[in-house]
Amino acid sequence: ETSPEDIVGMQVSQGILTVRGGMTSHAAVVARGMGTCCVSGCGNDNNVAIDYDAKVITINGHTFHEGDWMSIDGSTGNVYEGQIATVASTENANFKRFMGWADANRQMKVMTNADNPRDAQNAVDMGAEGIGLCRTEHMFFAEDRIKAVREMICARTVEERKAALAKVEPFQEADFTAMYRIMGERPMTIRYLDPPLHEFLPTKAEDIAALAADMGMTTEELNNVVVSLHEFNPMMGHRGCRLAVTYPEIAEMQTNAVIKAAIKVSAETGKMITPHIMIPLVGEVKELKFVKDVVVKTADALIAAAGVDMKYEVGTMIEIPRAALTAGEIAKEADFFSFGTNDLTQMTF
C-alpha cells in the first residue's frame, strides 16, 4: 500500500497498483485527485509476492521484472500482462450539453483539491471555480526539500529549526506563486501542515544514517528522535494545529510563503489575490486563536512592509467531533469553515 512518503513516486507514475487498500485508501484517493489510473487492493499475500531487492512481482503465478509491461483498468480492477492499446478519453457531446444546462441554472460553485501547480492547471482546464483544499504537506516530500524538512523535525533547538525552515520557505513560496498565477482571482484554500511529523522521517537504515551524518548526530540519537515522534494513534495525535502550537515557527514560515507569493502575483498581474489560510484539526477555540495570532502577526507585517492593501482570511476545518460541538465558539475566531468529512465520520462512528 502507499503512504504520504510515496507521493513523489506516485506523481511520476503512469499507473498505481497496490496489494492492500480499497476505494478510500491513500492510493485510491491520491490517484483520483491526480487523474492517474489506479487499482487498489488487488489481492493478498497468498496470490501476490513482491521481492523488493530483486525488483520482481509475482501475481497469480505471472512474474514481472522491472521494465516489463503490465496494463491496469481502474474502472474494473483488472490487471493485464503486457501492453494493451488504449485511446485517450474524449468529452461526450451530450454530456457537455447537459452540463451546460446545469451551469446555466446552478447556484453552487464546484471547486477541487489541488496540491501542486500541475493539479491547479488541470483544475482550471476542467472548469473548477477554485481550489477548496491545497494540502501543503504533499509539497514537502519532493526530493529537493525533504532533507530540509527532516532537519527541521529533528532540530534540537529553535534556532536549528528556524534555519531548516528557512531552507523550506523558498520552495513553498515558489509553489504558491505558481498556483496563484494559474488560479488568478479564483479562491484557493491552503491548509497548513497537518500529518504527524514521523510520516516525514526516513525508515530505511541507510537513510537514517545519512540524515544523522548531515545533522552531526549519531544514528542512535536520531533513532531515539524517530521513536519519540512515532504516534500510537496518528489520527488523534500530535498533528494539525497542535504542531503549530508546539512549533509556531512552522506556521510563521508557511504564512511568509503564502503572503509573499500572493503579493508577488498581485503585483505581476494586477489581480486581487485573497489568500484563504486553513488551520487544520482544531477542536477548541483556544487552539485556533493561538495559531491565528501567529498568522495575523506575520501576515500583517509582510503586507505593511510591501505597502499594499491585501485582504486574507484565516479559517479552519471541522473534522473532529469536538470542533462540531464547539463550532459556535470557534466561529468567533474563524473567517470560514470547511468540513473534513472523512476524519469526522471515522471519529464519530
Regions found by a protein language model. Give the residues of each.
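Conserved alpha/beta-domain cores
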Residues: 91-97, 101-349
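Acidic, glycine-rich flexible loop/linker segments
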Residues: 1-134, 138-152
